């Protein structure tokens, strides 16, 4: 059976730390969607380790790590990231069905974003959307294509016949087919030894009774179907994406663990009802180090949105919830939680499709002094204990972990 870690907000929730805390119990850790727009940061002995494509299980020698078919891969990024961990042969497996982000995807991503002007999505400009677009239009390049570079050249040449209009439409210059192929040919020999049919690999692992942990990227509120559209990512970020992005069946998923911060953040544009633009937002940003792992952009910050978290937990079928960065709220006299919205003159406790026009209804809690570094629930200040217990009641999902600092060992396990 497989367990699943999924983000419950707009990404950057701390999924990497949760995976790191649990990965030692598993034989396989699987990334199943997204690309190098994801950024999982783990702190080991005060040293930050940032992962963009590699599964977080890479930090455990016994873990085998799988990049599934639902991931879109920048080959150069993957190669550079892998080098930092030495010889990964036998520990890293990449799906031959995963799609490749090619140089022109990044150019298209940036050009399209600029053309949107005031309606810009806030994309990372990493080529993720255009790559998924080619996948859906059945015009993409997969890892399996690296095995026959002559046929791949023909495919890239054919793709270019369909995208030449882009140069005029967006006033950009695309790299030549020759330069794209040279780029691929220089990297392919170093990537191919890791490429395999990972679906068969995972099925075989299941038959042997081995334990699998699936690791989501981004967050549920960025899901292409159920997120704050159009300000979303291009993949299925909720639990169902773990099946389509890995080859596992729905019945193979034993439990889903949601991950949320004790407050909310968002990168890029789009709806964010509890955002605080002033002193509170800046205090959360600085205390939480809220700057993107991938882009370095300052994250928008605000109070915990229990309505959004409850919605996302229901979408994912969460058995439990991990609350991260509780320590960032240390020292606040009052802590707010959004428990409902004002919408069209009424009070509601759900997320409408017209999410841009809601106003948060808050419940206030008495703040606390210090939780940083605390590792047992009873050692938390009584006000912080009350906050966690009330979140559990409001959301209706058991809270099983609470993080109290960036350090990997500062985690309260509640069973």
Curated annotation (Swiss-Prot):
Q: Where does substrate bind?
A: 293-299
Q: Which cofactor does it need?
A: Mg(2+)
Q: Does Magnesium count among this protein's keywords?
A: yes
The alphabetized UniProt keywords are: Cytoplasm, GTP-binding, Ligase, Magnesium, Metal-binding, Nucleotide-binding, Purine biosynthesis
Looking at the record's lineage, which domain of life comes first?
A: Bacteria
Active site residues per record: 12, 40
Residue positions binding GTP? 11-17, 39-41, 299, 325-327, 403-405
Q: Which residues bind IMP?
A: 12-15, 37-40, 124, 138, 218, 233, 297
Give EC number(s), comma-separated: 6.3.4.4
Q: Where does Mg(2+) bind?
A: 12, 39
Could you tell me what reaction this enzyme catalyses?
Answer: IMP + L-aspartate + GTP = N(6)-(1,2-dicarboxyethyl)-AMP + GDP + phosphate + 2 H(+)
NCBIfam families the record matches: PRK01117.1, purA
Q: What is this protein called?
A: Adenylosuccinate synthetase
**Which species is this record about?**
Helicobacter hepaticus (strain ATCC 51449 / 3B1)
Organism lineage reads as: Bacteria, Pseudomonadati, Campylobacterota, Epsilonproteobacteria, Campylobacterales
């Amino acid at each position: 059976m497989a367990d699943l870690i999924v983000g419950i907000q707009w990404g950057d929730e701390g999924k990497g730390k949760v995976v790191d805390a649990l990965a030692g119990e598993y034989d396989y850790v699987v990334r199943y969607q997204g690309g190098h727009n994801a950024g999982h940061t783990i702190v080991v002995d005060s040293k930050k380790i940032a992962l963009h494509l590699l599964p977080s299980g890479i930090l455990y020698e016994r873990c085998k790590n799988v990049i599934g078919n639902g991931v879109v891969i920048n080959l150069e990024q993957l190669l550079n990231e892998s080098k930092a961990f030495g010889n990964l042969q036998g520990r890293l497996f990449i799906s031959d069905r995963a799609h490749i982000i090619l140089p022109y995807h990044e150019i298209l991503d940036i050009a399209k974003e600029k053309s949107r002007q005031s309606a810009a999505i806030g994309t990372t400009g990493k080529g993720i959307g255009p790559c998924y677009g080619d996948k859906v239009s059945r015009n993409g390049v997969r890892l399996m294509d690296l095995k026959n570079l002559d046929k791949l050249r023909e495919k890239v040449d054919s793709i270019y016949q369909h995208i030449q209009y882009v140069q005029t439409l967006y006033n950009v210059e695309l790299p030549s087919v020759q330069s794209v192929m040279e780029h691929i040919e220089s990297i392919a020999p170093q990537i191919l030894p890791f490429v395999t049919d990972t679906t068969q690999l995972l099925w075989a692992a299941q038959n042997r009774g081995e334990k699998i942990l699936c690791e989501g990227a981004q967050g549920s509120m960025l899901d292409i179907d159920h997120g704050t559209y159009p300000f979303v990512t291009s993949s299925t970020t909720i639990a169902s994406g773990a099946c389509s992005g890995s080859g596992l069946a729905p019945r193979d998923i034993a439990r889903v663990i949601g991950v949320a911060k004790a407050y909310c953040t968002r990168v890029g544009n789009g709806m964010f009802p509890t955002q605080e633009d002033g002193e509170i937002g800046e205090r959360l940003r600085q205390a939480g180090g809220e700057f993107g792992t991938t882009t370095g952009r300052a994250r928008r910050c605000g109070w915990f949105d229990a309505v959004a978290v409850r919605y996302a937990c229901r979408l994912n079928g969460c058995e439990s919830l991990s609350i991260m960065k509780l320590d960032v709220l240390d020292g606040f006299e009052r802590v707010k939680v959004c428990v409902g919205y004002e919408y069209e003159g009424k009070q509601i406790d759900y997320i409408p499709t017209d999410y841009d026009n809601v106003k948060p209804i808050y419940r206030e809690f008495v703040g606390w002094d210090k939780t940083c570094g605390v590792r047992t629930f009873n050692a938390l200040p009584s006000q912080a204990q009350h906050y966690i217990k009330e979140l559990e009641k409001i959301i209706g999902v058991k809270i099983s972990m609470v993080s109290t600092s960036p350090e990997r060992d500062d985690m309260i396990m509640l069973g």
